[in-house]
UniProtKB/Swiss-Prot annotation:
This is Tetratricopeptide repeat protein 33. It comes from the Eukaryota. TPR repeats lie at residues 59-92, 93-126, 127-160. It comes from Homo sapiens. Keywords: Phosphoprotein, Repeat, TPR repeat. Gene3D superfamilies: Tetratricopeptide repeat domain (1.25.40.10). The modification Phosphoserine is found at residue 197. Coiled coil: none annotated.
Length: 262
């Protein structure tokens, strides 16, 4: 009679050498998969680098073309080239700064300020961008903001004589002229009309007995004066006589003898 026992696992029938062979093959396949995945990621990264290099190269080409057009005063075409370059390299502060200069040459101050602000935003350590921003702000009449921008540019590059002698000096001169003009305007302004506050006017009680009595006396006096009419009568001989005529219709002297004048 056969004795009862646990069933052996199938794997136990496989020899140790065969098992090791399977494990080695599985490890090789895993290495191949890992290598393929690594190669794929590397290829994507390399392709991205190539695209970025191509964009940067194309952007530089467009930048140079725009600069050449701007030197020949073909400003609109230069702006178009730089806009195309910004599509490829939107973080290039130099493109915004150059665009701002050209817009100032076209007397388009609001877009010039906006472009200079974008240049400062992309590269706040660029003294050229701050200098251009200050000049654009001067074009808008924002003297205080322009002075601040020039001061930032000097803080970045303190040895720049152009900012000291031209930009900042000119901005401060304009500021002094503005202050003088404001003082003159203020001195020539007409005197303001004095406005009385309600508290400065006495609050009379027009229904008091005293006010009513005064009004009644004035009315009675006017009534008495109007009841009498005064006439100046000039006689034919030239004599002048003043006659008071009553309201009851008193008859004046004969008109054939006197000439009546009122």
């Amino acid at each position: 009679m056969a004795s009862f026992g646990w069933k052996r696992k199938i794997g136990e029938k496989v020899s140790k050498v065969t098992s090791q062979q399977f494990e080695a093959e599985a490890a090789d396949e895993k290495d191949v998969v890992d290598n393929d995945e690594g190669n794929w990621l590397h290829a994507i990264k390399r392709r991205k680098e190539i695209l970025l290099e191509g964009c940067a190269e194309k952007s530089k080409q467009l930048k140079d073309e725009g600069a050449s057009l701007a030197e020949n005063k073909r400003y609109r075409e230069a702006i178009q080239k730089w806009d195309e370059a910004l599509q490829l390299t939107p973080n290039d502060a130099t493109l915004y700064e150059m665009k701002s200069q050209v817009l100032m040459s076209l007397h388009e101050m609001f877009p010039a300020v906006h472009a200079a602000e974008m240049a400062v935003q992309q590269n706040p350590h660029s003294w050229e961008s701050w200098q251009t921003l200050g000049r654009a702000q001067l074009g808008l009449g924002e003297i205080i903001l322009a002075i601040r921008s020039f001061q930032v540019a000097l803080h970045i590059y303190p040895m720049n004589p152009e900012i000291w002698k031209e930009d900042l000096s000119w901005a401060r001169t304009l500021q002094e002229q503005q202050k003088v003009a404001q003082r003159i305007k203020k001195s020539e302004a007409p005197a303001e009309v004095t406005h009385f506050s309600p508290k400065s006017i006495p609050d009379y009680d027009f229904e008091s007995d005293e006010i009513v009595a005064v009004c009644a006396a004035i009315a009675e006096k006017e009534k008495t004066v109007s009841a009498n009419k005064t006439m100046v009568i000039v006689s034919a001989s030239g004599a002048i006589e003043t006659v008071t005529e009553k309201e009851d219709g008193a008859t004046p002297p004969d008109g054939s003898v006197f000439i009546k004048a009122r």
